[in-house]
Amino acid sequence: MNLKLQLKILSFLQFCLWGSWLTTLGSYMFVTLKFDGASIGAVYSSLGIAAVFMPALLGIVADKWLSAKWVYAICHTIGAITLFMAAQVTTPEAMFLVILINSFAYMPTLGLINTISYYRLQNAGMDIVTDFPPIRIWGTIGFIMAMWVVSLSGFELSHMQLYIGAALSAILVLFTLTLPHIPVAKQQANQSWTTLLGLDAFALFKNKRMAIFFIFSMLLGAELQITNMFGNTFLHSFDKDPMFASSFIVQHASIIMSISQISETLFILTIPFFLSRYGIKNVMMISIVAWILRFALFAYGDPTPFGTVLLVLSMIVYGCAFDFFNISGSVFVEKEVSPAIRASAQGMFLMMTNGFGCILGGIVSGKVVEMYTQNGITDWQTVWLIFAGYSVVLAFAFMAMFKYKHVRVPTGTQTVSH
């Protein structure tokens, strides 16, 4: 099989299995299993708990002892088993435990798939910068397609979404076994555990600007978790109104939500221009403003014609909110730190956004939703306005505290890291 096609299938399956349940599990737990907001928040925070340390730990295993191919296959085997078990779970405590174990297995694969892809491309004499992005985009396509399949199959509120995820995980394991062997690098054999775990990057907190940047990374990472947890659940809440129960938005909430991912792929293309023209601080400010709009538009959106326009606009600005912080933030880290700790600093950035930010967003937003839910009815407008208010506070705090003087460079020389 052609190398690029092989890696495209790998990326497609990696994110297709995640897309089958990540944005709809909250709806299934809230509507079908009747979990409260705090319980749902706890389940989703498990992704953050796993993201704090598991990628680094299994990255070390793949670097020093066991081929990345086999670590990757073992992780997805565990993932298939736990998703199969999750489909049969009906209590918050059991769901938290099963999804936590699943997260321990899945989160490291986000880095391992890059390791596998980079090695194969470099071994074939290809350029990662030019050849990898067109491969990675198939991951986003897979995520979107899974959302559509689950929605059109009527499984958004069903445990069947988890069976689909388990089946896709099993298929991915079998496909991984067909890949060529990837040798253990052993390049880090003489490094200390402190260096291997990326703990050297904690020294960056001595730099005031970097410390502020990482703290805001966590606070903004929390906003992404809010969307993953409750966006789909919110759209399904309109089925309690007879006027909206049969509307396309309620019946196929995942398809509407997938506009967010489509927008994300388009906004990536604008990052080089905005970074070179306006600088990291202004680009990140645009991201925070986009989060304000994301939540405010949700607050006033509904399945009416005008409300639908507001909901679609909310999905579109999500692409800006996500990319202008996550991608631009990665570029900022790349340019600000010394080459010696660049990889550790990138790991720190991911730890703050996908780890601690995920935990914070899961716990706090779950409590907010629980607080404004009475007799199974959630006051979503108030909930979204609270999150929008949180974003407004972040915007003013970021503007006042983060100091950065931009030196404009030609667009063509701006490097964007994916």
Swiss-Prot record:
This is Nucleoside permease NupG. Keywords: Cell inner membrane, Cell membrane, Membrane, Symport, Transmembrane, Transmembrane helix, Transport. It is a multi-pass membrane protein. Belongs to the major facilitator superfamily. Nucleoside:H(+) symporter (NHS) (TC 2.A.1.10) family. It comes from Escherichia coli (strain K12). The keyword Cell membrane applies. Changing residue 140 to A: Abolishes the binding affinity for uridine. Inhibited by the protonophore uncouplers 2,4-dinitrophenol and carbonyl cyanide m-chlorophenylhydrazone (CCCP), and by valinomycin. Inhibited by the nucleoside antibiotic showdomycin. The lineage of its organism: Bacteria, Pseudomonadati, Pseudomonadota, Gammaproteobacteria, Enterobacterales.
